[in-house]
């Protein structure tokens, strides 16, 4: 009898080991470099640094300890450092130079980072606006020159004692040799103590033009997918203007964007706590970077489940790649009713009417969704809706503009949306224009922001997604922007002039020939320069706005396109790839960086076409997914494996109630039938809109529009005059039912199609038909029975309009 052997196919992944950084140069006797022994097997990485066996081919050139820290030996040269772990090995070459050269710690590059790491110059300590106990440092060491003067020349020289460094207050207090309100921060046996002590012993050398300046940071690993519960060491290396590099890991400030997924300690050791992704943010010497660390969800998903996902465009490809890495399975595609309602709301801010729904549900053509999207993007309501959105962004209201200026600004925005003006042209039309605000509505942007500081901060947040306000007073604590960059940027707008026009309420915008804004500490103007760009001479007669507009709309300025792409994505998908949608700082990375980069690239390559961007997103399967969770994605509200439910905005909700009931909302001073989304001004009184979060348009901040639930909202919905009056309106839809003599079944179909974009279920229909049938049994006159029937219909419509299915976009 033959023996049968069954072979089970199991995916085998060859484990690979690498040493990071892949190349190392040690410069000077104090150079150190933490190495990582990092393995890769399949989709996962693993940190073997603490258990690996480390060896050097020549310890006299460079030695490596059991922790993987390599340091110079007795002479210069090259050496091979090897790590062995789990039966495999990896080797890198380390170059050593100036191993025995004289060395002095730098105040800028060593002492200041030590003070920052210890928290001495934090906002809670001596970096506070008023300092602590008469000792004030600049926040996180943003101005080393000022800090040097404070340490060495103030307090009668007691903070730094050149005669006996150990008696320096800067050592005595943080080491707790004498009482210190901040506690023990600086153990005497620490490297940090030695850095400060040896710097003082060397004569406390000041800052010098010969000091190497930091040019950038590298992080290792830049990204890693780890197993649940795993740990990972992060290593940060700084590069300097003289070409040398330094391991600055121990002086970096670390934080995690999602501590439910991963936490990080003071020394860069990451611990995985849950499933998903976390950005480990690194702050060092006014520079920020992050490492993306992830752990997949604990789901076993077969490959065919991903293969069945219908990919329509690059959005689906990149979303699918993210889900695979995180072990998330997408929800199915939403049914036609859900998609139809969602598309109408997201593209045009309205509900489909009952005829729209019936026609769409009856349509059997395979491309009906694509055709619907195309039709929606050509409707007047699309123009109303997106004009309203951009008016929110640009703060159009009579709060700060007169009525004429408000209307001309709004009409300019609406005309731009109607003609699908490219976004780069939209920006140029604002920043490059001069003349009368009556004749050119875009110029009212400068009337709104007459103050140079306000104009600078609004422009950077509206068009670049950068909140630079902190840098007005000091280097940004959470971003790379410095105070110097802030005032260089502000000086681009210092010569924007505003004067009265020839007609009442008119203003004229012009470029002044002179005028600068002063750096508050330096007490002098700085050469104007966009963020991270070259400056222009202070004495140049060129309109500085030209330089700004050219830089702003350049395809190489990724912040510009990235910001508006993320805003549009957030509007359609309920959450930005970067969230909040207007906070695109480096320490707030996208949930799918590859997808955002691809959207930005596609947007730029197709001429900054907003309508095309919306069409691209809405045509993706990703946009059309159901919001109903499956067994893998119930907890996902970040990676779009299911559609994210959102409450209707105040204006959309009010207009939808008016649409379903056939009773338009009256707005004082506006023609009958004006919808909330057609109002150019948020100062138009409406308690309902105010209660549901209509923004006052004071600040350029996505948080101005609130979606938080309140008691006031509940009262408006449950028993408010706004809805009750619409239900009982004598010329509304419910009154029309009686006049037309529609059957109960047809009435139910109509109200469900109008409110929910679907037919009632059998259970809903049976319950409501029974309720309507009871009205026929009311004793008394025919009029009493008609009144009872009308009241029953009002109650049914009220029940539909106060239900979550109506109040939310699914």
What are these regions (language model features)?
Residues 3-12:
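Sec-dependent N-terminal signal peptides
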Residues 13-17, 205-216:
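Proline/serine/threonine-rich low-complexity linkers at boundaries of modular beta-sandwich domains
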Residues 23-30, 58-103, 108, 112-117, ...:
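Solvent-exposed helix-loop boundary motif
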Residues 39-43, 238-242:
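Short solvent-exposed capping/turn motifs at the termini of beta-strands
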Residues 46-59, 195-203, 246, 250-260, ...:
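Short, well-ordered beta-strand segments
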Residues 116-138, 198, 202-210, 467-482, ...:
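Periplasmic/extracellular electron-transfer cofactor-ligation site
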Residues 307-668, 699-700, 704, 724-792, ...:
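Primarily short, surface-exposed interaction patches in extracytoplasmic proteins
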Residues 796:
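Globin-like tetrapyrrole-binding proteins
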């Amino acid at each position: 009898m033959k023996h049968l052997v069954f072979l089970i196919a199991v995916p085998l992944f060859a484990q690979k080991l690498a040493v990071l950084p892949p190349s190392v140069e040690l410069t000077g006797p104090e150079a150190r470099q933490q190495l990582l022994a990092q393995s890769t097997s399949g989709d996962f990485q693993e940190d073997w640094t603490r258990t690996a066996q480390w060896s050097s081919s020549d310890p006299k050139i460079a030695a490596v300890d059991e922790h993987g820290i390599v340091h110079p030996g007795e002479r210069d040269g090259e050496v091979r450092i090897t790590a062995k772990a789990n039966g495999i090995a990896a080797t890198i070459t380390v170059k050593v130079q100036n191993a025995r050269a004289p060395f002095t710690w730098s105040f800028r590059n060593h002492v200041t980072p030590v003070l920052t790491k210890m928290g001495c110059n934090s906002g809670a300590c001596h970096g506070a606006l008023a300092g602590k106990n008469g000792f004030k440092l600049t926040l996180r060491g943003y101005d080393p020159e000022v800090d040097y003067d404070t340490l060495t020349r103030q307090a009668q020289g007691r903070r730094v004692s050149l005669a006996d460094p150990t008696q320096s207050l800067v050592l005595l207090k943080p080491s707790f040799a004498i009482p210190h309100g901040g506690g023990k921060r600086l153990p005497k046996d620490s490297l940090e103590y030695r850095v400060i002590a040896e710097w003082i012993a060397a004569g406390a050398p000041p800052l010098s033009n010969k000091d190497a300046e930091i040019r950038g940071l590298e992080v290792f690993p830049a990204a890693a997918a780890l197993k649940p519960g795993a740990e990972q060491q992060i290593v940060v290396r700084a590069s300097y203007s003289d070409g040398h590099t330094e391991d600055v890991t121990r002086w970096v400030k670390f934080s995690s964007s999602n501590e439910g997924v991963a936490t990080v300690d003071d020394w860069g050791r990451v611990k995985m706590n849950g499933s998903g992704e976390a950005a480990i943010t690194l702050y060092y010497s006014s520079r920020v970077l992050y490492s993306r660390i992830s752990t997949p969800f604990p789901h076993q998903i077969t490959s065919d489940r991903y293969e069945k996902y219908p990919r329509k465009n690059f959005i689906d490809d990149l979303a699918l790649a993210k889900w695979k890495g995180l072990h998330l399975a997408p929800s199915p595609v939403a049914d036609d009713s859900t998609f139809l309602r969602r598309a109408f709301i997201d593209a045009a801010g309205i509900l489909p009417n009952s005829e729209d729904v019936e026609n769409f549900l009856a349509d059997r053509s395979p491309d009906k969704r694509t055709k619907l999207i195309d039709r929606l993007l050509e409707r007047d309501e699309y123009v109303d809706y997106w004009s309203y959105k951009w008016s929110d962004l640009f703060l159009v209201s009579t709060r700060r503009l007169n009525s004429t200026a408000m209307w001309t600004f709004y009409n300019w925005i609406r005309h731009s949306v109607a003609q699908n003006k490219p976004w780069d042209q939209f920006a140029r039309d604002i920043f490059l224009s001069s003349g009368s605000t009556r004749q050119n509505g875009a110029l009212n942007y400068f009337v709104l922001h007459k103050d140079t500081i306000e104009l600078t901060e609004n422009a950077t947040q509206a068009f670049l997604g950068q909140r630079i306000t902190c840098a007005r007073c000091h280097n940004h604590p959470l971003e790379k922007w410095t105070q110097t960059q802030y005032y260089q940027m502000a000086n681009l707008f210092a010569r924007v002039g505003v004067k009265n026009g020839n007609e009442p309420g008119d203003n004229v915008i012009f470029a002044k020939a002179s005028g600068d804004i002063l750096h508050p500490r330096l007490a002098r103007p700085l050469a104007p320069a966009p963020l991270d760009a070259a400056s222009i001479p202070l004495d140049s007669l060129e309109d500085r706005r030209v330089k700004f507009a050219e830089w702003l709309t350049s395809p190489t300025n990724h912040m510009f396109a990235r910001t508006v792409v993320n805003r549009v994505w957030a509007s359609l998908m309920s959450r930005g790839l970067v969230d909040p949608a207007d906070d695109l700082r480096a320490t707030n990375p996208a949930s799918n960086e590859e997808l955002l980069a691809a959207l930005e690239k596609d947007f730029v390559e197709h001429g900054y076409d907003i309508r095309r961007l919306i069409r691209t997103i809405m045509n993706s399967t990703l946009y059309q997914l159901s919001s109903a969770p499956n067994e893998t994605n119930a907890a996902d509200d970040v990676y779009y494996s299911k559609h994210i439910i959102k409450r209707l905005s105040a204006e959309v909700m009010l207009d939808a109630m008016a649409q379903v009931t056939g009773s338009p909302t009256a707005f004082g001073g506006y023609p009958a039938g004006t919808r909330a989304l057609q109002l150019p001004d948020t100062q138009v009184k409406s308690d309902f809109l105010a209660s549901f979060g209509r923004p006052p348009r004071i600040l350029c901040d996505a948080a101005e529009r609130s979606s938080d639930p309140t008691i006031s909202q509940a009262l408006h919905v449950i028993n408010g005059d706004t809805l009750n009056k619409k239900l009982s309106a004598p010329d509304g839809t419910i009154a029309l039912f009686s006049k037309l003599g529609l059957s109960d079944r047809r009435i139910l179909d109509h109200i469900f199609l109008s409110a929910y974009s679907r037919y009632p279920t059998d259970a809903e229909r049976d319950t409501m038909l029974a309720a309507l049938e009871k009205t026929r049994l009311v004793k008394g006159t025919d009029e009493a029975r008609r009144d009872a029937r009308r009241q029953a219909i009002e109650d049914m419509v009220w029940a539909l309009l106060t239900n979550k299915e109506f109040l939310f976009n699914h």
